[in-house]
Amino acid sequence: YTNNFKDRVSKIYLPKVDFLKKVIKSNINILDIGSGGGHFLKALEIRKINGFGYEPNFSLVKLGQKKMKKNKLINLDLKKTYKKVLENNKSNVLSLIGVLEHLDKPNYIINLFNKSKIKYLYISVPLFSLSTFLENSFDNVFPRQLSGSHTHLCTKESLNFFAKKNNLKVIGEWWFGTDFPDLYRSLINSSNSNLPKYKPHINKYLFSQIDALQSVLDKNKICSQAHMIFEKN
């Protein structure tokens, strides 16, 4: 996570910003909670979008501060960060990129958002999907979904319930998972085969079709990750 900062921003976080820009056509000003190393804030900066972030991990904040020229990343504990949501009067988007799944009480920050002056909510969350079953079966492979720091996973149904419960309108959604890449990773890392043909064969019969296979799950909204943008009704 802390390595290859520039590549991560370019390949992972710039697409998240571009998706946001496609959905919200007006000027965007971001309050980013749980900013980590500031990758999303840097991507915003590259796209000339103002962003202000808070992160409780001091080491990650130091990393992000070195990389940014305009957008700000501040080290602040979670309780004090929550107050910033209510106090904010400049931002029109609250972003929680890979954050809700780490919170013991995710509804708390959502309630603060509902009480705030911020109009839009942008989230990225892991989903209960094929990857979940793979991780449960290949317990020797590093888990992405069933990580010990994840308190819960979402589904299409739970996200729709979330929107209805909080009187939010879904104005943008991007379903894009890594289930089949996870399958490929699990098979490669768990194989006992020493045959030189093993990897070329699995590349031919799985990896070569990985995007097409993944698109089936993405289109049916049963993939491993979702990005959603909500607007207050």
Which residues are covered by each model-predicted region?
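Short, glycine-/aromatic-enriched active-site segment of Class I SAM-dependent methyltransferases
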Residues: 124-152, 157-162, 186-188
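A short glycine-rich, Lys/Arg-flanked "PGG" loop and its adjoining helix->strand segment in the class I
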Residues: 107-121
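A short His-aromatic
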Residues: 98-102
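A SAM-dependent methyltransferase catalytic signature shared across enzymes that methylate proteins
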Residues: 158-174
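Conserved N-terminal segment of class I S-adenosyl-L-methionine
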Residues: 1-89, 93-97, 107-111, 139, ...
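Glycine/Thr-rich phosphate-binding loops of Rossmann-like dinucleotide-binding domains
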Residues: 82, 104, 131, 181
